Amino acid sequence: MSNSAMSVVILAAGKGTRMYSDLPKVLHKLAGKPMVQHVIDAAMTTGAQHVHLVYGHGGDLLKHELTDPALNWVLQAEQLGTGHAMQQAAPYFADDEDILMLYGDVPLISSQTLGRLRQTKPQGGIGLLTVKLDDPTGYGRIVRENGAVVGIVEHKDASEEQRQINEINTGILIANGKDLKRWLSQLNNNNAQGEFYITDIIAMAAEEGQRVEAVHPERLSEVEGVNNRLQLSALERVYQREQADRLLLAGVMLLDPARFDLRGELTHGRDVVIDVNVVVEGNVKLGNRVKIGAGCVIKNSIIGDDCEISPYSVLEDAVLDAECTVGPFARLRPGSELAEGAHVGNFVELKKARLGKGSKAGHLSYLGDADIGSGVNIGAGTITCNYDGANKHKTVIGDDVFVGSDSQLVAPVSVANGATIGAGTTVTHDVAENELVVGRVKQRHISGWQRPVKKK
């Protein structure tokens, strides 16, 4: 076991040719965030003093996406192997610290496995993460003598006897900084690939009499890499099933775990029910007895106790108090707030709007930049006209207001408590308390009207 301080190196310089994309491979997303961000997050949980990111292709894109100031960016101008990548980072290694080596395209490595690897590393020597495969073709084999790890041989360089070994190298290892710098300086590229292999340091350590201790991950998926979109989609399904299983065991009822996507963090109360094809993004909090209908997208939102979100509704940066109902086919955009018992119905859109206690907007309305009191009825087709072509303006509606269907409120405008807006009215001036406002075109009756007929 090593008690030394530790830094992490993440190799992320590969182009990812088999992704057939202009995006660097490690920026392709798994569960809504770049693969390499998953690795960075795992690294940050290890207590690492420094995280060195070795990059090459698409450096500008990487730096634009990964903005954590704790990252130390290390350029690998030419991709000449894993050993060469580590050589670029070596000047940053302290002699008295351990160096943990990770890969930006191995996104599901867990902090628990990394913790066990760190605990396994001997005071002098190397801790190595390995797995056993039924078909190890293409992978570097772990060579042992009398049970002790003495080397790693790459598949292309392996003899027929060595190719029968089913214990393979994952590439993830931990070693002392001083030792690692010495071994890296001794690497050569005398192999079939003409590259500098980091794996050659295992034999160097064994020749020096230093121990190499191997540990296995809890799950094979933790060490599976991504080289193409098929592999990425497979790991996406693995990850999503793991999240679904965790939520089920915690008491969330997922009606079909295979059709649920979590792309962030979900906290929840008791007896939550989530229907099929729901996507949860960012940080979402669900209270007790919340029901989410099929096909909903919930992003960075807080939903209170006993709320029901009907199918195909989209909520982003919204806050709902208890007993609210939303949808179906409703959209709550950033800044939407619903007080207790409020209702937003089908084809209603809110943006920077607050709907007071017990207020209802049942159908076909747009409420933007609006503060709406309690007990308000918003009729079908109501629009708060908040944009004048250059600036946004606010609509304020008091308590117990009735807004008739097909009304327009041209902001900035205020409607006081108890007022009534007749159907089809365009409100351009403030409305006083308990007033009735009607502003529609006078109805005409034309007797004997003949409808037009189609020309032959």
Swiss-Prot record:
The keyword ATP-binding is assigned to this record: no
Keyword Nucleotidyltransferase: yes
Positions of acetyl-CoA binding: 380, 386-387, 405, 423, 440
Residues annotated for UDP-N-acetyl-alpha-D-glucosamine binding in this entry: 11-14, 25, 76, 81-82, 103-105, 140, 154, 169, 227, 333, 351, 366, 377
GO cellular component terms, semicolon-separated: cytoplasm; membrane
Any one Gene Ontology molecular-function term assigned to this protein's record: UDP-N-acetylglucosamine diphosphorylase activity
Cellular compartments annotated: Cytoplasm
Principal location: cytoplasm
Keywords assigned by UniProt, alphabetized: Acyltransferase, Cell shape, Cell wall biogenesis/degradation, Cytoplasm, Magnesium, Metal-binding, Multifunctional enzyme, Nucleotidyltransferase, Peptidoglycan synthesis, Repeat, Transferase
Active site: 363
SUPFAM superfamilies: Nucleotide-diphospho-sugar transferases, Trimeric LpxA-like enzymes
Catalytic reactions on record: alpha-D-glucosamine 1-phosphate + acetyl-CoA = N-acetyl-alpha-D-glucosamine 1-phosphate + CoA + H(+); N-acetyl-alpha-D-glucosamine 1-phosphate + UTP + H(+) = UDP-N-acetyl-alpha-D-glucosamine + diphosphate
Residues covered by region (N-acetyltransferase): 251-456
Region called Linker, residue ranges: 230-250
Pfam families per UniProt: Hexapep, NTP_transf_3
CDD domains: GT2_GlmU_N_bac, LbH_GlmU_C
GO BP terms: cell morphogenesis; cell wall organization; lipid A biosynthetic process; peptidoglycan biosynthetic process; regulation of cell shape; UDP-N-acetylglucosamine biosynthetic process
Entry similarity comment: In the N-terminal section; belongs to the N-acetylglucosamine-1-phosphate uridyltransferase family. In the C-terminal section; belongs to the transferase hexapeptide repeat family.
HAMAP family: GlmU
Subunit architecture: Homotrimer.
Protein's job: Catalyzes the last two sequential reactions in the de novo biosynthetic pathway for UDP-N-acetylglucosamine (UDP-GlcNAc). The C-terminal domain catalyzes the transfer of acetyl group from acetyl coenzyme A to glucosamine-1-phosphate (GlcN-1-P) to produce N-acetylglucosamine-1-phosphate (GlcNAc-1-P), which is converted into UDP-GlcNAc by the transfer of uridine 5-monophosphate (from uridine 5-triphosphate), a reaction catalyzed by the N-terminal domain.
Entry-linked PANTHER family: BIFUNCTIONAL PROTEIN GLMU, NUCLEOTIDYL TRANSFERASE
Protein's UniProt name: Bifunctional protein GlmU
Organism: Pectobacterium carotovorum subsp. carotovorum (strain PC1)
Taxonomic classification: Bacteria, Pseudomonadati, Pseudomonadota, Gammaproteobacteria, Enterobacterales
